Amino acid sequence: MNSAPKLNTFQHLIGEHQTFLEAKRIAKQFSLSELPVLITGKIGTGKNHFAHAIHLESSRSNEPFISVNCSTHSEETLIHELFGPNGNTGVFQKAVRGTLFLDDVWRMPASVQAQLLKALDSDTEKPRMICASADRSVEHTFRQDLFYRLNILTLTLPELSERKSDIPLLTQHFLSNSGQQLLIDPSVFPVLEKHAFEGNVRELKNAADYMAAVSSGGTIQPYDLPPYIRGTIDGKTSKKKAKLLTLMEKAEFLFILETIKVLNEKGEPASRRIISEHSKNTQTSLTPQQVRSRLDYLEKKDYVTKSRGRAGTKITFEGLSFIETLKNQMI
């Protein structure tokens, strides 16, 4: 049971995609009603957050919001949790003037369904019922008379794959909550947008937490992404391009890219003059003019991005993949 969740008003539900805004609009309308709400959506789409937002916007906002996950309790424990040892001291009674949120409701055992139906059919005061489920495949096992008591106002939440344009906004929001002052390089977003995110917004938050933890500079770079997300990008194209280069060109590009990577990780500028200085004590000595021409090539291939001023040159995710390709071909 959770009776004191973190504040989740509609203002705290982040997103600008039309499908998400429509879900918020419908949810706000539902908050004006006393009828039961059924929220459906995949794992990590924010069912708990929407349920709490509906409660906080409703006339019951000053009363308890109590959440119970029906899939994490045994049959006996769930009955005890909902109705208490003597049938009238459980959370159903405690939430009577507020909202009772039943998560993963289709997983509720048959005996508990019968007792819940009996409580809803009684003449006594009842809580506002909000239910949620991520798995509709077990819906047919739910008793129909109770199903139609709970499934009156239905809200379906969009998956993150349906609103990929919200990924930059959500990522920046999660990073801002990390307690660190972090920026995010624009080259990170295309990589995130190519990932499937089967865990939806929850998985994206986990990725943002990972990036905040491993980042050594003030700006999140593609190499700060979780390995399982970096690994979703296909490196076949870079392998084909590398085969067309001479051995000397491969050595020069490898040196330049590795130098840029190190400078990026340290938060130091990667200008052609600095790269040239680093090359003087190596077998790959390059003048600033030579570095410039090599950087022009790398930029055309999307291996680096060049910026004016202190920011200098940044390596991209494709550039990181190209480093590994060059290393393998030079063994």
Swiss-Prot record:
Annotated Sigma-54 factor interaction domain residues: 12-213
Induction profile: 8-fold induction by growth at 15 degrees Celsius.
Keywords attached to this entry: ATP-binding, Nucleotide-binding, Two-component regulatory system
GO molecular function, one term: ATP hydrolysis activity
Superkingdom of source: Bacteria
Disruption phenotype: Cells grow much more slowly at 15 degrees Celsius.
SMART domains reported in the protein's UniProt record: AAA
CDD domains, A to Z: AAA
GO cellular component, one term: protein-DNA complex
UniProt cross-references to SUPFAM superfamilies, sorted A to Z: P-loop containing nucleoside triphosphate hydrolases
PROSITE patterns noted in UniProt: SIGMA54_INTERACT_4
One biological process term in Gene Ontology: phosphorelay signal transduction system
PANTHER family referenced in this protein's UniProt entry, alphabetically: SIGMA L-DEPENDENT TRANSCRIPTIONAL REGULATOR YPLP-RELATED (PTHR32071:SF119), TRANSCRIPTIONAL REGULATORY PROTEIN (PTHR32071)
Task of the protein: May play a role in cold adaptation.
Protein name: Putative sigma L-dependent transcriptional regulator YplP
Species for this entry: Bacillus subtilis (strain 168)
